[in-house]
A protein has these predicted regions:
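Gly/Pro/Ser/Thr-rich low-complexity, intrinsically disordered segments predominantly at protein N-termini
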Residues: 1-181
């Protein structure tokens, strides 16, 4: 077997992790907030630098060397124009390369084995960095080929593969201010 093909018309999306099908879970508020904030920061950086595309829930077919091609749907993905030109990104609905950067936001239904397997697969398939956001602990784990580190609320999100991207971890978890109407 060389490829696992999953239906792409099912919502929430399906992924192939640890030799089984997993259906993504609709996020709770804190998950959705962290996901949208991270995607917004990454997209603002990508647009300002003409660097590529940052999209939530973008389906990819990834294949680490010597393994089967499988579907993964990161909470946020960034794909550079360097690795896939803009015209190709606009034309292809399902990229068959790993994203440059991935954000996975933990939810209560995520199994740690499954999260670790996704990190392994992304990095083995060519992803430069995987950010694992934990809304309960209010941390961001940064995983790359050199290992991993954990950022707290007082730290900034940044990575050498995304030059110029920098924002405070705490912004991922802060509620918007309430205004009187």
């Amino acid at each position: 077997m060389q490829e696992i093909i999953l239906p792409d018309n099912i919502k929430p999306a399906l992924e192939w992790v640890n030799n089984r099908i997993l259906q993504k879970v609709s996020p709770e508020r804190k998950h959705g907030l962290a996901q949208s904030r991270f995607c917004g920061a990454l997209d603002d950086w990508a647009v300002a630098n003409g660097a590529g595309t940052a999209v939530p829930e973008w389906r990819f077919q990834v294949q680490p060397p010597g393994e089967i091609r499988r579907t993964l749907v990161p909470d946020v993905a960034f794909l550079s124009y360097e690795r896939m030109p803009q015209s190709e990104q606009e034309r292809i609905a399902l990229p068959t390369i790993a994203p440059d950067a991935v954000v996975e936001v933990l939810s209560r239904d995520d199994g740690s084995r499954d999260v670790e397997e996704k990190i392994r697969v992304y990095l083995a398939a060519g992803t430069n960095v995987v950010f694992v956001v934990d809304p309960d602990e209010r941390t961001v784990r940064v995983c790359d080929s050199d290992g991993q580190s954990v950022l707290g609320e007082e730290d900034d999100v940044a990575h050498r593969s995304l030059p110029g991207l920098r924002f405070p971890v705490r912004t991922l978890f802060a509620s918007p201010p309430q205004r009187s109407l």
